[in-house]
Amino acid sequence: MLLMESGTIIESVRDAIAVASGIIESAEQEVAWLVPAPLLVIAARYNLNEKSKVLMQRGGRIRGITSISPPYLNAVRELVHIGEEVRNVQDYSGEFMLVGDRNQSISSMSVVAEDIALDSKIVAFWTDNPDYAEYLLSIFETVWQEATGARKVLSEF
């Protein structure tokens, strides 16, 4: 990780998972994420689903967007089962973002998610700048409005 005055550059999937975990743990109201489906498997493996469940048990809300396809049905079903609101965007890949309580965020440049592993190199940016979080949330909300509910998509498989 490289520390910068206004944020931190994240250089590995391992560090990105740690940062995302910290954002979820510190959130009190809402977490919103837009993530390629292969990253959901890694996130679950490293207990992000459990941390999300704790937030929801405390009254928080989690909304997420991914591309639902057969290899990732179980990962999405688990998120829906624990209470996350998940929507589908066909053929989504590339960047990821996670925003907690409209102030902390991590976002990436393009990621080749199918080939990703814990030690893979990435370029992502963490910041606690609320203006940047609002910018990311504006993108999230636009995609959210166009996305299809996961329950509907899951019922088609």
Give the label of every model feature segment.
Residues 1-19:
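N-terminal localization/anchoring segments of enzymes in phospholipid and broader phosphate metabolism
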Residues 2, 32, 64, 144, ...:
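Residue-level signal for secondary-structure boundary elements
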Residues 11, 33-36, 65-68, 89-90, ...:
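Short His-Asn-centered micro-motif
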Residues 16-81:
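Primarily the HKD phosphodiesterase
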Residues 16-19, 132-136:
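Internal, well-ordered alpha-helical segments in soluble enzyme and binding-protein domains
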Residues 84-132, 140:
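HKD (HxKxxxxD) catalytic microenvironment of the phospholipase D
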Residues 135-157:
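Cysteine/selenocysteine-centered motifs that mediate thiol-based redox chemistry or coordinate metal-sulfur cofactors
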